[in-house]
């Protein structure tokens, strides 16, 4: 190859490269190009799409529907009754909230671990699923004033009754994922083997089938379950700190949060939650439980 041919080839390559660079520069300046701020947002983990925001009170009223996340397998708090309808302590509360807003209620059934996600993804307006207030959850959602108080309990077969946590060492404890029982035992009782289930129904079936030595969740729940399942007993009725249960909304949704808080105060003046207890919980607990050990009126402990 002669020198003149080589020189022509090099010039052609340089010219082509320059053309490509110029074309890329023009494209970068076009309407689809990311601005420096957008690039910074992306590199810092920020979303370039708009945030999914919660519905305002006006939007809820105009839609005619209040969207509420509830349990469908946790009697007597949230479950499906024999007629296929949502029922329970939380459901009575949800129906009253919707009534006072002048709308109907639309229920979304959730597993314990999904109670935060349905709010952050804006699938519901309120989570009202026996939701215990914790510092970790407060970082992700906003809690209203409480309407119940609760601790953990442990239920087991009465012929092998667990009456002290020390008896669980080396044994299998059934829990539901995403619950305070899960976090409590992982943090405080590492020698207890945890068998986890997504749904309460599956967890209780595991206990009934003998796949674990005991089951732990809210004491209000295990006390109710043991009353309707012969051969089981709540040997530990109060474990860990006494916590509260409250409605939750999407983080930053102050308008709906303030409305719920005002509603809880108003309902307290008519003793609403004690009436709810009489209707939904007393038929299960009977005289074994003092309603004042569970019920919180007006958000005041």
Language-model features, listed with the residues they occupy:
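A ligand-binding cleft/hinge motif common to bilobed small-molecule-binding domains
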Residues: 117, 131-139, 208-209, 213-242
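Periplasmic-binding protein-like
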Residues: 148-156, 223-264, 284-301
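Extended ligand-binding regions for polar small-molecule ligands
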Residues: 30, 45-47, 91-100, 179, ...
């Amino acid at each position: 190859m002669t020198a003149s041919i080589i020189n022509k080839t090099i010039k052609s390559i340089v010219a082509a490269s320059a053309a490509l660079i110029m074309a890329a520069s023009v494209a970068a300046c076009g309407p689809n190009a990311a601005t420096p701020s957008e690039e910074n947002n992306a590199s810092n983990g920020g979303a370039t799409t708009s945030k999914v925001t919660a519905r305002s009170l006006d939007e809820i009223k105009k839609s005619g529907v209040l969207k509420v996340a509830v349990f469908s397998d946790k009697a007597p708090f949230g479950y499906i009754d024999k007629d296929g309808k949502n029922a329970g302590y939380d459901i009575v509360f949800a129906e009253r909230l919707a009534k006072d807003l002048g709308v109907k209620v639309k229920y979304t059934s959730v597993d314990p671990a999904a109670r935060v996600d349905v709010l952050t993804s804006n699938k519901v307006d309120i989570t009202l699923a026996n939701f215990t207030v914790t510092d970790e959850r407060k970082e992700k959602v906003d809690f209203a004033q409480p309407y119940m108080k609760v601790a953990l309990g442990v239920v087991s077969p009465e012929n092998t009754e667990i009456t002290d946590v020390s008896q669980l060492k080396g044994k299998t404890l059934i829990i539901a994922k995403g619950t305070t029982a899960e976090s409590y035992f992982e943090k405080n009782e590492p020698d207890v083997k945890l068998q986890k289930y997504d749904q309460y129904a599956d967890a209780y079936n595991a206990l009934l089938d003998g796949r674990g030595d005991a089951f732990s969740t809210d004491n209000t729940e295990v006390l109710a379950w043991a009353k309707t399942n012969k051969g089981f007993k709540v040997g530990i009725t109060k474990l860990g700190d006494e916590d509260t249960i409250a409605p939750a909304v999407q983080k930053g949704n102050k308008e709906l949060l303030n409305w719920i808080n005002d509603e809880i105060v108003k309902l307290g003046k008519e003793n609403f939650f004690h009436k709810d207890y009489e209707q939904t919980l007393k038929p299960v607990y009977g005289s074994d439980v003092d309603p004042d050990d569970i019920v919180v009126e007006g958000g005041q402990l």
